[in-house]
Amino acid sequence: MTNSNKLSGKNILITAGAQGIGEAITKHFIDSGANVAIHYFSSADTANELVKYATDKGLKTIAISGDLTKEEDANALVKITVEALGGLNILINNAGSLVARKMLSEMETEFWHKVMDINLTSMMFVTRAAAPYLAKNENSSIVNLASLAGRKGGHPGSLVYATSKGAILTYTRALASELGPQGTRVNAVAPGLILGTSFHNTHTTKESAAETTKGIPIQRAGNADDVARAVLYLASEYDGFITGATLDINGGVYNM
């Protein structure tokens, strides 16, 4: 039996599902026969391409824009998703950003709150809105996107990003305990160096990536598909007794 058998016909919401790791996750769900709601903030063209990709396979799909740091946008996202797909089985909390590198000495209070809102508060907004719908389905699940930076602190200038991603590790465990009785599993993935994404294209130099790759035991950086496959595993019913866990996807390196 394959993952596609477990995911076929399931209704999935992926935040930031039209770029980088999120785009790969969306494609893998579509290829597994799942119906998808694709949230995006600015990647409208890619979102529409993904909608066509899913529609051509006979799947239900919708692309929804929104600023998830706004409570009303998060609530609307979930409402529109449920109306379009007919329910919700799986939530993928992928939205997040480093925004910029800033050391503590140059950290403005406004910037701190901005990154925390993008990475953490928005996740709470969407999850809070989605939880009652997830409760209506057996074996529902949530997968949160954390980061190796949340375990190790990240590179210089990652203070608020790493802090927010570290909070997601605890958020995942706490939520697993809270939502377990309703039948919803909650897990996370913590990617390491994942190249070919806008995140690292923007915030990681080629020299830094090459130096980091030297320290990875399997001698290569990760890619978006590496993360997507792990997300689909945790989202599926195959891990029915795994909840509150964080799966590290970093090639065996823990000192980035």
What is the meaning of each model-derived region?
Residues 102-104, 111-114, 200, 208, ...:
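Substrate-binding pocket helix/loop in short-chain dehydrogenase/reductase
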Residues 2-4, 98-101, 232, 243-256:
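Short C-terminal tail/terminal secondary-structure segment
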Residues 127, 164, 172:
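Active-site helix of classical SDR
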Residues 105-124, 143, 168, 218:
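Catalytic Tyr-X3-Lys loop
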Residues 139, 180, 185, 242-244, ...:
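Short, small/polar-rich loop/turn modules that mediate ligand/substrate recognition or access, typified
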Residues 48, 181, 191-216:
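A glycine/serine/threonine-rich, flexible loop-to-helix segment
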Residues 147:
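Residue(s) in the substrate-gating loop at a strand-loop-helix junction
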Residues 132, 177-178, 240:
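Alpha-helical segment proximal to the catalytic Tyr-Lys
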